[in-house]
Amino acid sequence: MASISAATATSSTKLVSSNSTNPLLPSSTKPSKLILSSSFTPNCSTLFLHSPATPSSTATHRHRRFTVRAARGKFERKKPHVNIGTIGHVDHGKTTLTAALTMALASMGNSAPKKYDEIDAAPEERARGITINTATVEYETENRHYAHVDCPGHADYVKNMITGAAQMDGAILVCSGADGPMPQTKEHILLAKQVGVPNMVVFLNKQDQVDDEELLQLVELEVRELLSSYEFPGDDIPIISGSALLALEALMANPSIKRGENQWVDKIYELMDAVDSYIPIPVRQTELPFLMAIEDVFSITGRGTVATGRVERGTVRIGDTVDIVGLKDTRSTTVTGVEMFQKILDEAMAGDNVGLLLRGIQKIDIQRGMVLAKPGTITPHTKFEAIVYVLKKEEGGRHSPFFSGYRPQFYMRTTDVTGKVTSITTDKGEESKMVMPGDRVNLVVELIMPVACEQGMRFAIREGGKTVGAGVIQKIIE
């Protein structure tokens, strides 16, 4: 079976730009923390990105060539599956930790050890010493199977991080014990809160560079206070200190190191024990009708077209009929293959990152931003009413008010589409002509293209490379 793995989350969409501060990738998304009603099934994120207000440079999309390998046998669902990822400031050691994790857990079976430069895969990333893409690796502990996303930490590419952050059931916040929390540490914690990452474990890295134990304790205290300030339970979150680099070097020298044989490798095991115990297995929305937002599309010669993404809800099996909804006319197709991590799957369920092979669909018929759904369960719409929070200047939002007729970008699931604000109502129900930064308002929005959306769905509003608002759909109008 040709591989239609969603381990292709080392996405084929590549962002390269000479001095790009505004990556233009649409974001994959998940719930934010605008709690407005308990009946919502939130899907879209509010993406709080504090990118510098520099002129938008010309970012070019370059597509990496796909190497399609044969599926390596069947995916066995023996353990509960959890999506996690590393977040934190640039050069604090996220990718190094990811490499150390895969190598330490390779002895558990089913986890291929990955070297640092295999995770930090693309040449542009290594050349600048900065991760620009999101790479997914898999590994297992005794109790669970993990899909791990390595998120970029560089401020210019925070936008690209969304693709990874939105797929997390929990996160490992990597913070250098030598430097303490930095601007992007804060940004990523805020972002995790907004895109609905429910739980977090902290790894204080570079412990070997801190001579004084008291300094490390001060950094730990600072991290706990920072987490509490963003409404995470800072006092309860497990914080493990260690050195990802020294652990990785020890594992490279001797891949069969067991627990108790090296203090730095033991810290990696200790971290995963904390992740196992502290990050709960998420309740999947498996009972609901199937829906998957398409993140990427590619062709396999002789087999057909594959759509990859994260199953948001429900289940899908080979032979199921699905609708392709949004951006163009809705059409139906049959799923002829389901794979995860280059292994054949009987059934994909909510939370899985999968590739679906679709019958009779050409690559040009389908694109990122569309959704695959159980027939008749979701329809494309262009007009809706939403409750929106407009970010203040201090939160990275607009400095000035906007008026009726305002045309920003609306980010929904994996798509971004221009929309026009046609009417403004205050939260007291009075009509208004103007929206100030910091306001909470009801807006009626008209999109220029139909998008699969529904009541309770969350979205972000962006303009000029920064997030200016966050909202949730109250009512579909047309």
From Swiss-Prot:
GO-annotated cellular components: chloroplast; mitochondrion
One Pfam family this sequence matches: GTP_EFTU_D2
GO biological process assignments: mitochondrial translational elongation
Region (G3), start-end ranges: 150-153
A GO molecular-function annotation: GTPase activity
Presequence positions on this chain: 1-69
Location of region: G5: 243-245
UniProt keyword terms in alphabetical order: Chloroplast, Elongation factor, GTP-binding, Nucleotide-binding, Plastid, Protein biosynthesis, Transit peptide
Binding residues for GTP: 88-95, 150-154, 205-208
Domain tr-type G: residue ranges: 79-283
The keyword Ribosomal protein appears for this protein: no
Main localization, broad class: plastid
Region (Disordered): 1-31
Highest rank taxon of the organism: Eukaryota
Region described as G1: spans on this chain: 88-95
InterPro entries: EF-Tu_GTP-bd, EF-Tu_GTPase, EFTu-like_2, EFTU_2, G_TR_CS, P-loop_NTPase, Small_GTP-bd, T_Tr_GTP-bd_dom
Biological function: This protein promotes the GTP-dependent binding of aminoacyl-tRNA to the A-site of ribosomes during protein biosynthesis.
Family in the record: Belongs to the TRAFAC class translation factor GTPase superfamily. Classic translation factor GTPase family. EF-Tu/EF-1A subfamily.
Protein name (Swiss-Prot/TrEMBL): Elongation factor Tu, chloroplastic
Organism: Nicotiana tabacum
Gene: TUFA
